[in-house]
Amino acid sequence: KPGRGTAEAKGDHGKIDVLTGTLGKAIGGAAGGYISGKKDLISYMRQKARTYIFSNSLPAPIVYGASAAFDLLMKDKSLVKKLHKNTAYFRKEIVKLGFTILEGDHPIVPVMLGEAAVAQDMSKELLKAGVYIKGLWFPVVPKGEARLRAQISAALSRKDINRALKAFEKVGKKMNVI
């Protein structure tokens, strides 16, 4: 997979009128997002889309950082390969530890915990162990489907991932999750 999103993965680039993307995860992890499409459509959206009209421009450092990240991804194909390798490794190892994850190969790995209180507590305990990970619960996800959202990156070394996995194991056992 080249890592250029769903449209490319599905071979749908020529069939899509509006392409949206986030800058809050893969590209720099800062904030914001983008839409792209034909000039007339984008011009219309700038005049009519309330979310655009009543919002602020992204700060210049975020735009510059995202642009630099896109340039880097275009030049260095090894980053996408490393991301896929890191993702596959984390997914395989977290399941070996006894955690349940949603299937897939996406670098955002939902570690399913069920109850909101468990996700909240585990997120706090992992932070104490040096791993920052967001918990999600109702109303963000359906009731009973609370989870931790692990975001795997090409910037992580195998040592980083193993350290996170050890923290998951320690906290998971302490909380009787695994």
Model-identified regions with their sequence ranges:
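Active-site C-terminal subdomain of aminotransferase-like
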Residues: 1-105, 117
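Alpha-helix N-cap and loop-to-helix initiation/capping positions
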Residues: 11, 114, 156-159
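Short, solvent-exposed amphipathic alpha-helical segments in soluble enzyme
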Residues: 36-38, 51, 125-128, 167
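Hydrophobic side chains in well-ordered alpha-helices
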Residues: 44-45, 122, 164
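PLP-dependent enzyme catalytic core of the Aspartate aminotransferase-like
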Residues: 128-131, 140-178
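Beta-hairpin "wing" of winged helix-turn-helix
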Residues: 135-137
